[in-house]
C-alpha cells in the first residue's frame, strides 16, 4: 500500500522485547561458587545446608544499605535493557524479616521509577525460613505481620512462595496464598 512506510534495516531484525518473569534486582553478595558445586552434582539442599543458598544472600542483603541495593539493582536493569528486556518481574525474598522485605520492595519501587523498563514487584517473604524464627511461627508471621504491611504500603501486587521439599510445604503455601 502507498500509505505504509518501509524502513530498510539491512541485515538486522526487529523482535519484541523480552519479558523476564523471574528476577531478583535488589540483593547483595556473591554465590558464583555455588554454580561449580551444582555442576559437580550437589543439590540445592546440600548447598544450603553448607551455608550457601538463599540464606547466604539473606545475610549479605540484610546488612546492605538501601541506597546500595538500589544502585546495584539499577545496574542490573541497565544490563537487562541492553539485552532486550522491556518488562520484568522483580521479587523480594532476600530479607525475610519485615523491615528487610519492606526495604527490598521499596528498592524495587525506586528502581522502577529510575529506569526505562516496566518492573512488576512480587513479595517473596516465603523464600526461606529465617534462623531467628521457627517454621510455623514464621508462616504465621508472614500471614499476620508481613502481608498486611506489604498490602497497606502497596509495595507488591503479586505473591510468590518457594514451595519445595525442605522449604515451604503445599499446605503452608496454600495458607500464604489464600491469605494474600
Residue ranges and their predicted role:
Residues 3-72:
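Metal-associated gating/positioning segment near the N- to mid-region
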